[in-house]
Regions:
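Polytopic alpha-helical membrane proteins, predominantly small-molecule transporters/carriers
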Residues: 1, 9-306
Length: 306
């Protein structure tokens, strides 16, 4: 970390993670080049998760697709960071953060995923083809399940990137709640690269370069892209703020990403109910779904209670 005798007064500009009198460029001219590269690399892998994440919702719907993908992301994202850090930096003893309480939380999370998966299977077997298409146009449980698991695994690389970039900040000069913001920026840059390459590939494959000249669609596209980006990024800004309040609890700090994903699952299923994706399912199926959601919520807080 940066532990030089820099002024402690904060800047009032938008660079919340950068002390007054310093610039973001100083972070990238440090000896953290390996961490910077690894943080961006896992951002690239996370970008793959983002691409497949959309497909999981296409084939499973918002509720089931997000539940399986984000549940897998929560469990693996929590474990992979310390494991990979221990491989590259054994002197940090990162595995020590994977306490019995944390492992129990992850296991309970995976149980919650399994229960929600059972609810999805029950939905697939109980509805007619017409009902399935009415709820989710391209519903395909086996295909969607495989894609959702892949999306969850790759999306977990976001938290791994944050783990490798944890020290890319100005140390004590940066408030705890802002310390992960530089790493978050690097991970999202890596994800942007993946998505940009894929979009350009699709443009070339489908010969749709001319669509960029259709000025009539630019207004709505830019507006909703900005809105989606702001709303989506706010969760990771909230993650950074939340970690700042959890520094006294190593267990909750390690599980913070898992907690965020669990809350995503809860609200995605609320939207799934609002959008009537579970319309026509038996009461038993709904009960199983709710049980899975409750298990995921419990998994976020159980380790702290043990």
């Amino acid at each position: 970390r940066f532990r030089h005798s820099f002024p402690t007064r904060r800047s009032s500009d938008l660079w919340l993670a950068v002390p007054e009198g310093h610039s973001m460029c100083e972070l990238f001219n440090s000896d953290n080049s390996f961490n910077i590269v690894m943080t961006m690399l896992f951002g690239v892998l996370w970008g793959v998760g983002g691409l497949t994440f959309g497909l999981s919702m296409r084939y499973l719907g918002v509720a089931l697709g997000q539940s399986i993908a984000l549940g897998t992301c929560a469990g693996l994202g929590t474990i992979m960071g310390p494991v990979l850090l221990n491989i590259f930096f054994p002197e940090q003893n990162a595995l020590a953060s994977l306490t019995a309480s944390v492992i129990i939380g992850v296991v309970v999370t995976l149980i919650g995923i399994a229960v929600i998966g059972v609810a999805g299977s029950m939905k697939a077997s109980s509805l007619s083809d017409e009902q399935k298409k009415e709820a989710v146009k391209d519903f395909n449980f086996p295909k969607g399940l495989a894609i959702a698991l892949l999306a969850g695994f790759m999306s977990g690389c976001f938290n791994v990137g944050l783990a490798f970039g944890a020290d890319i900040n100005f140390g004590d000069l940066t408030p705890d709640m802002y310390k992960t913001l530089p790493a978050t920026m690097l991970v999202t840059v890596g994800g942007f690269f993946t998505n940009a390459v894929y979009c350009l590939y699709q443009n070339n494959k489908n010969r749709t370069w001319g669509d960029y000249l259709k000025t009539s669609v630019w207004g709505n596209n830019i507006l909703f892209c900005l809105l989606a980006g702001a709303l989506w990024y706010s969760q990771f800004f909230g993650l950074s703020l939340g970690k700042g309040f959890l520094t006294e609890s190593a267990t909750l700090t390690t599980l913070s990403f898992c907690i965020l994903m669990a809350l995503n699952v809860v609200f995605s299923n609320i939207w799934g109910i609002i959008l009537k994706e579970w319309k026509g399912c038996s009461p038993k199926t709904i009960v199983v779904l709710v049980v899975g959601i409750v298990i995921l919520i419990i998994s976020s807080f159980l380790p702290q209670l043990i």
